[in-house]
């Protein structure tokens, strides 16, 4: 039973979150994405092939991993692990359920501009990182924030960001992810959540205590595996429902601009709903501009910042245009198109018996059977949430050390493991809302620094060859 304190605080935090997500963040992050798309002359298109070759062409796949760094591929895998969390299934389902199939179109639009933003984050993280004498690499938004703003103001912004991300991702964020793991494992397989919690913290402790190198070694294996499993299952569904694929794409584009007025408020409200849901999910799923993934990209051992910037672009592409899109196509082709139970629901289906937690299960269940579909989604959610915990823990640790020094690392790890276990055994809506609020607040100093350092990013995007003298590691 919620205490009076929780009852009082919950609506306040919820109101702040709604204001931030509906107004401040959409405008700020979309604005930064459009700004960098223009200033870099559409770097996400110009340099897409270059980034693709770096990731899949064996150029940096087996790159140097000396000191405290990673290969470029490991850094990308760690970044994708953070991006592809439970939101890639539950969040997308919620956006479609609320905003209709048209929300997917706006996810694509936002993600296109987000690719330019994440290029800026990765290049700045590389440019401002610090390599210590023992090979340890320190990098992330706190370092380019203090580069953008000198003196007390810069330290304040960096400190604000560090506190927000440590709490939002390192503690409460990991708690939210472990909660999803515990709930899905108990529902799908009947495993008690406390057992899941114990197993989870044992595995996490082994990886955390192994440092950056062990984490990188795990993510470079887990991320391709989890993506392959989800893509394989999704493709099976799409093959079975192949005759509805043209209708699915038609619904995405048609309802992005002409949604049916299913929800109260009429035509205009339905369009705003599709745009807002698609925009928010697009922003929060790819994490471009939020300041999380630059921590991973800063650790990559590459010749120049531009290289890792192009690799970061591919991360958003894989997250949004491959995994997220596949999930959206599965949901729409099975539930909205043809003879689906939500057929004709162009805007939203809030009055139905579906919710964001069971929509994906029902979608996969139409082909696999509900029980098998639930188990498949549960397995995928486990991998997605587990990989996110690993990356978010690293990002939080980097900022904890920035705030309190190296001696705080072990204390942080112990606290993180406690929060991970608690997350599997309890559900607290206030924790979810506080995590979302801090997650959104950390965007503000990061976005301000990104705009202030535009000239640095433009320099790298236009003249990478002349800036390739730095060798890391």
Q: Which role does the model predict for each range below?
A:
Residues 1-86, 96-103, 114, 421, ...:
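N-terminal alpha-helical transmembrane segments of multi-pass membrane transport
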Residues 6-8, 39-44, 88-92, 101, ...:
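Transmembrane helix-loop junctions in multi-pass membrane proteins
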Residues 28-35, 39-52, 161, 178-185, ...:
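Membrane-interface loop-to-helix entry segments
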Residues 32-37, 110-135, 142, 146-179, ...:
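Helix-loop-helix module between adjacent transmembrane segments
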Residues 42-70, 94, 100-103, 116-152, ...:
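Flexible loop linkers connecting adjacent transmembrane helices
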Residues 61-97, 124-127, 133-142, 146-148, ...:
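Alpha-helical membrane segments and immediately flanking helix-loop junctions
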Residues 113-121, 198-212, 223-243, 281, ...:
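Selective recognition of specific alpha-helical transmembrane segments in multi-pass small-molecule
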Residues 119-129, 133, 235-251, 259-266, ...:
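Extracellular/periplasmic helix-exit of transmembrane alpha-helices
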């Amino acid at each position: 039973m919620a205490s009076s304190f929780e009852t009082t605080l919950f609506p306040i935090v919820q109101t702040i979150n709604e204001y931030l997500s509906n107004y401040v963040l959409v405008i700020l992050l979309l604005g930064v994405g459009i700004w960098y798309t223009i200033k870099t002359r559409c770097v996400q298109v110009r340099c897409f092939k270059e980034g693709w070759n770096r990731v899949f062409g064996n150029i940096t796949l087996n790159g140097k991993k000396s000191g405290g760094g990673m290969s470029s591929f490991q850094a990308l895998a760690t970044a994708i692990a953070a991006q592809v969390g439970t939101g890639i299934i539950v969040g997308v389902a919620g956006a479609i359920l609320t905003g209709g199939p048209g929300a997917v179109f706006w996810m694509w639009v936002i993600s296109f501009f987000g690719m330019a933003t994440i290029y800026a984050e990765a290049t700045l993280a590389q440019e401002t990182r610090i390599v210590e004498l023992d090979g340890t690499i320190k990098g992330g938004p706190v370092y380019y924030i203090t580069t953008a703003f000198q003196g007390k103001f810069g330290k304040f912004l960096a400190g604000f960001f560090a506190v927000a991300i440590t709490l939002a991702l390192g503690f409460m964020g990991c708690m939210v992810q472990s909660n999803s793991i515990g709930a899905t494992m108990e529902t799908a397989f009947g495993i008690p959540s406390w057992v899941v919690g114990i197993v989870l913290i044992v595995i996490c402790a082994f990886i955390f205590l192994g440092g950056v190198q062990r984490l990188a070694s795990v993510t470079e294996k887990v991320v391709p595996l989890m993506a392959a499993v989800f893509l394989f299952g999704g493709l099976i569904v799409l093959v079975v429902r192949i005759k509805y694929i043209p209708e699915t794409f038609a619904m995405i584009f048609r309802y992005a601009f002409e949604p049916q007025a299913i929800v109260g408020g009429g035509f205009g409200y339905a369009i705003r709903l599709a745009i807002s849901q698609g925009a928010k999910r697009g922003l929060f799923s790819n994490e471009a501009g939020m300041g999380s993934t630059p921590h991973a990209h800063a650790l990559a051992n590459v010749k120049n910042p531009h290289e890792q910037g192009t690799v970061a672009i591919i991360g958003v592409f894989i997250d949004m245009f491959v995994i997220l899109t596949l999930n959206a196509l599965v949901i729409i082709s099975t539930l909205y198109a043809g003879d689906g139970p939500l057929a004709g629901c162009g805007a939203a289906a809030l009055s139905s018996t579906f919710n964001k937690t069971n929509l994906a299960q029902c979608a996969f269940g139409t082909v696999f059977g509900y029980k098998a579909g639930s188990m498949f989604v549960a397995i995928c959610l486990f991998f997605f949430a587990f990989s996110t915990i690993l990356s978010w823990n690293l990002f939080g640790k980097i900022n904890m050390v920035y705030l309190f020094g190296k001696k705080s690392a072990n204390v942080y790890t112990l606290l993180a493991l406690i929060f991970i276990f608690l997350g599997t055994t309890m559900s607290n809506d206030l924790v979810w809302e506080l995590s979302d609020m801090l997650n959104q607040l950390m965007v503000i100093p990061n976005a301000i620094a990104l705009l202030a350092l535009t000239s640095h990013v433009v320099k790298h995007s236009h003249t990478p060859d002349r800036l390739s003298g730095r060798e890391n590691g």
